[in-house]
């Protein structure tokens, strides 16, 4: 701008001022003012975070102290004086400073001497870590060289097993006697306190007592003579009819087996030989046949009453009412 303006204007152009130009007069400035005045107090940018780690900040504070040692409050004060960014949010970064002091081996805690004013211990740098930064540059730390395999430092840095693993070492003489030589095989021996489920036997049909068989008295039962044997009722097995059993026995007292063993005689040749013929005046033989092959709770005894023709009474457990009966209309049932 020196070739356009006079020397006083050239000096103004070199100064840190802001110039305001008009669109009507593009070559001439209308006004000028300092940049800080135009920016105003509300537009001041906040301070930037310094590009240093917390370890570098602590090392700066220690090396800046006259005796190369400083208290914790001295470290806080040094950081806030040098870096305005740490004026705010003190609790956050101060906690980080304390953690780095306690976790890093390069910082050594020195107790305060007796009689020295003040409180708190001092912090200093380990003599082996004085040159941990490259050429005094606090932005870059030197990498620690790996110790040799046989050096004492490598033995010190070796990770020792935890106490739980050391305590469980079987090679020790005390634990070798305490531990069993071999664990029991679960597949061969059952576990203690466990029992196999016991199999409950299902009650089968008990043998019939001949004394508990049904006895029939009366002329009606003898006259009918022929009772049918059920072909397919409840799937109960029936004993085959004996060959020497009489067909028309007129005895007043006989067993139920002789009644069940009697086969009906076909009335005509047109009827099938295997199909039984129903008898109107007969008692439901299906009930009697089924009761002989069922479990013991279903066994019962029926006795005809001699005083009442066609009537009978029950002995034993209650008579099951859902069994089909074929009883003539004149028959009277009486239950006790």
UniProtKB/Swiss-Prot annotation:
Signal peptide: none annotated. Disulfide bonds: none annotated. Keywords: DNA-binding, Nucleus, Transcription, Transcription regulation. The keyword DNA-binding applies. InterPro entries: FH_FOXL1 (IPR047514), Fork_head_dom (IPR001766), FOX_domain-containing (IPR050211), TF_fork_head_CS_1 (IPR018122), TF_fork_head_CS_2 (IPR030456), WH-like_DNA-bd_sf (IPR036388), WH_DNA-bd_sf (IPR036390). It is found in: Nucleus. SMART domains: FH (SM00339). GO terms for biological process: heart development; Peyer's patch morphogenesis; proteoglycan biosynthetic process; regulation of DNA-templated transcription; regulation of Wnt signaling pathway; visceral mesoderm-endoderm interaction involved in midgut development. One of its GO terms (cellular component) is nucleus. Residues 242-252 have a biased composition (Low complexity). Residues 140-214, 227-252 are annotated as: Disordered. Residues 48-139 bind DNA. GO terms for molecular function: DNA binding; DNA-binding transcription factor activity; sequence-specific DNA binding. SUPFAM superfamilies: Winged helix' DNA-binding domain (SSF46785). Disruption phenotype: Deficient mice show postnatal growth retardation secondary to severe structural abnormalities of the stomach, duodenum, jejunum and decreased intestinal uptake of D-glucose and levels of the intestinal D-glucose transporter Slc5a1. Transcription factor required for proper proliferation and differentiation in the gastrointestinal epithelium. Target gene of the hedgehog (Hh) signaling pathway via GLI2 and GLI3 transcription factors. This is Forkhead box protein L1. It comes from Mus musculus. The lineage of its organism: Eukaryota, Metazoa, Chordata, Craniata, Vertebrata.
């Amino acid at each position: 701008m020196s070739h356009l303006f006079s020397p006083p204007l050239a000096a103004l152009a070199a100064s840190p001022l802001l110039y305001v130009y008009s669109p009507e007069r593009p070559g001439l400035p209308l006004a000028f003012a300092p940049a800080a005045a135009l920016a105003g107090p509300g537009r001041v940018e906040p301070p930037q975070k310094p590009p240093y780690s917390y370890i570098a900040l602590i090392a700066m504070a220690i090396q800046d102290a006259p005796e190369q040692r400083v208290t914790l409050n001295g470290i806080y004060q040094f950081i806030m004086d040098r870096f305005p960014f740490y004026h705010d949010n003190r609790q956050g970064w101060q906690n980080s400073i304390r953690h780095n002091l306690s976790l890093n081996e390069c910082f050594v805690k020195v107790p305060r001497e007796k009689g020295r004013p003040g409180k708190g211990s001092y912090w200093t740098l380990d003599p082996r870590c004085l040159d941990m930064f490259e050429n005094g540059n606090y932005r870059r730390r030197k990498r620690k060289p790996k110790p040799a395999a046989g050096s004492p430092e490598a033995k010190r840095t070796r990770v020792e097993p935890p106490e739980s693993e050391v305590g469980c070492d079987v090679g020790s003489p005390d634990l070798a006697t305490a531990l069993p030589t071999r664990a029991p095989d679960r597949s061969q021996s059952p576990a203690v306190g466990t029992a196999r489920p016991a199999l409950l036997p299902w009650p089968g049909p008990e043998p019939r007592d001949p004394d508990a068989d049904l006895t029939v008295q009366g002329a009606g039962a003898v006259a009918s003579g022929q009772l049918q044997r059920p072909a397919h009722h409840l799937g109960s097995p029936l004993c085959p009819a004996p060959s020497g059993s009489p067909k028309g026995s007129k005895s007043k007292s006989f067993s139920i087996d002789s009644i069940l063993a009697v086969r009906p005689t076909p009335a005509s040749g047109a009827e099938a030989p295997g199909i039984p013929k129903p008898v109107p005046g007969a008692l439901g033989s299906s009930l009697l046949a089924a009761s002989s092959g069922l479990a013991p709770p279903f066994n019962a005894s029926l006795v005809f009453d001699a005083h009442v023709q066609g009537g009978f009474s029950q002995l034993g457990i209650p008579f099951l009412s859902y069994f089909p009966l074929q009883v003539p209309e004149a028959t009277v049932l009486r239950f006790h």
